[in-house]
Amino acid sequence: MTKTELLGVYRTSANHIRLTYASLVLWAYPDTTDFFEELYSRMDSIPKPFVDLPTLLRDDRAMRVACEELYESAHRSALNGLFPLTKLYCQETGQLDKLKAQPWFQFWRILRNCFAHDMRFNFNRDEKSLLPVSWSGVTIDISMNGKPLTNGQCSREKLRELFESAQSFITNDVA
């Protein structure tokens, strides 16, 4: 993978988060559900695999939960997918030590493992030896072992900051 290709994956991930946000803004508008149902009913040429979709769209509580999860999953997906690609690129270009020296590297690594394994912290021996790890005012420590990650522990704003820090590192600090 080239640096240009890796930065392309970062851009695609950022666009995924942005598009998800734009979708949530649209769903927050009171008339969006009516507009969607009218448009959807006229679109005969597209598959409609979710017959219960209008019911979901009219259920305020279910929509709130679904929208929150959609936004969360866009952030998790970006950070979960980019970590191994970033690490692989740095390893293949002889810059892994530079990556590991970043103040957010171990934090991201442990957070990514949480994302990839049921959204719970299940620290392995190596991770336990590194704890506590802190980055940007957020600390992951041994007391979190076996517990789920919550938005209160690491907000979407912090996830975006982590994403932007890693993207800036690839853009500016590696060859």
Model regions and ranges:
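Amphipathic, Lys/Arg-enriched alpha-helical patches that create a basic surface
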Residues: 3-33, 71-91, 130-175
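Short, contiguous, well-structured surface segments enriched in hydrophobic/aromatic residues
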Residues: 29-99, 103
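Generic structural signal of hydrophobic/aromatic residues within well-ordered alpha-helices
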Residues: 36-39, 53, 111, 159-166
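Peripheral peptide segments
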Residues: 37, 42-44, 48, 122-135, ...
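Histidine-centered, metal-coordinating catalytic motifs and their short helical/loop contexts
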Residues: 102-125
